[in-house]
């Protein structure tokens, strides 16, 4: 991505003069570190009301990079798919070497700079049975404040990877929450789980529409390296989901049409008793497999999170006498 494309994207997002989230993802965004510096400086110098977040594979986190990220106040998410052996089997360098050692070294570099992070785990059939290992790693590393589980979306390279089954997902999350409770008692610090936080937030809402996906509400877009704007990062290169570009802006009517199309395709979610507390499943995940059953593992994940969130709320109320 060129600086001119990046600047136009920021200016377009800032047009509404409302706070927004500027998410740097990829590919690997740290490969474009000079551009990230320019973007962060631009946001700060123009006093643009943007929260900046970055999702990285963690292999390029040096002292210099960590210092920049801290000074720029960029939130950091690191991809970690399990304990080192599990991660290495799923994420390798081109020469076949596993990346886990470099990821852990990068996270420790962030810790030395006083930076807390979130861990994101892409869940597949190959690591679903090992998800509790991510929680162990989070406590072990010491500077992890949150863990999130993102089920595979079968587009691009993900189309060749097997998705996790619903029953395996439910069992894995039961183990995750049990271990988190145990380690929380042992350390006096309970790790935040993103899906639990979302469930607790949705439990307080008064509406009942789709809230899982910004694209389904016309509230978020993805800009590719060439400046093309898509409804979702999963559909980059698919003209059907093209909404415009950073030079001409967003076709608002097309954005509404795509959002409605997504909601219509996920209409089966509305018949579920848990819909209001769930917010609906991921359109891209279902589209990649072509049938409603593709959402079963996601449903299992969310139901487990809702159950655990409710249990935590009940225990909290008991302690406070409410």
Label each region the model flagged:
Residues 29, 59-60, 83, 124-125, ...:
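Short, solvent-exposed loop/turn segments at secondary-structure junctions
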Residues 93-101, 108-212, 216, 225:
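Radical SAM enzyme [4Fe-4S]-AdoMet core and its adjacent flexible, acidic
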Residues 3-25, 32-152:
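Radical SAM/AdoMet-radical enzyme domain recognition
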Residues 168-203, 233-279:
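C-terminal accessory region of radical SAM enzymes
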Residues 226-228, 264-322:
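Radical SAM enzyme core and accessory elements
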Residues 84-88, 156-159, 281:
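Short acidic/His/Gly/Ser-rich catalytic and metal-binding motifs that mark active-site loops
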């Amino acid at each position: 991505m060129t600086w001119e494309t990046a600047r136009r994207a920021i200016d377009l997002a800032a047009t509404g003069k409302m706070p927004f989230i500027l998410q740097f993802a990829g590919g690997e965004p740290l490969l474009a570190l000079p551009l990230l510096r320019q973007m962060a400086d631009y946001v700060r110098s123009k006093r643009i009301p943007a929260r900046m977040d970055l999702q990285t594979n963690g292999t390029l986190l040096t002292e210099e990079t960590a210092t920049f990220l801290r000074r720029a106040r960029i939130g950091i998410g690191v991809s970690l798919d399990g304990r080192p052996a599990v991660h290495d089997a799923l994420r390798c360098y081109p020469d076949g070497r596993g990346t886990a050692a470099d990821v852990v070294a990068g996270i420790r570099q962030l810790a030395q700079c006083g930076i807390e992070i979130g861990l994101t785990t892409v869940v597949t059939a190959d690591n679903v049975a090992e998800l509790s290992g991510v929680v162990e790693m989070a406590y072990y590393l010491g500077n992890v404040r949150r863990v999130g589980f993102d089920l595979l979306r079968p587009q691009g390279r993900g189309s060749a990877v097997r998705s996790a089954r619903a029953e395996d997902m439910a069992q894995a999350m039961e183990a995750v929450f049990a271990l988190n409770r145990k380690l929380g008692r042992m350390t006096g610090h309970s790790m935040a789980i993103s899906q639990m936080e979302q469930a607790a937030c949705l439990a307080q809402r008064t509406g009942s529409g789709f809230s899982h996906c910004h694209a389904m509400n016309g509230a978020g877009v993805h800009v590719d390296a060439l400046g093309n704007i898509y409804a979702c990062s999963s559909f980059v290169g698919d003209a059907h989901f093209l909404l415009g570009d950073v030079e001409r802006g967003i076709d608002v009517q097309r954005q509404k049409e795509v959002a409605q199309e997504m909601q219509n395709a996920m209409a089966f979610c509305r018949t579920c008793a848990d819909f209001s507390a769930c917010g609906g499943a991921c359109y891209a995940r279902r589209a990649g497999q072509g049938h409603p059953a593709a959402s079963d593992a996601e449903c299992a994940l969310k139901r487990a999170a809702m159950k655990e969130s409710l249990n935590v709320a009940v225990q909290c109320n008991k302690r406070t006498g409410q």
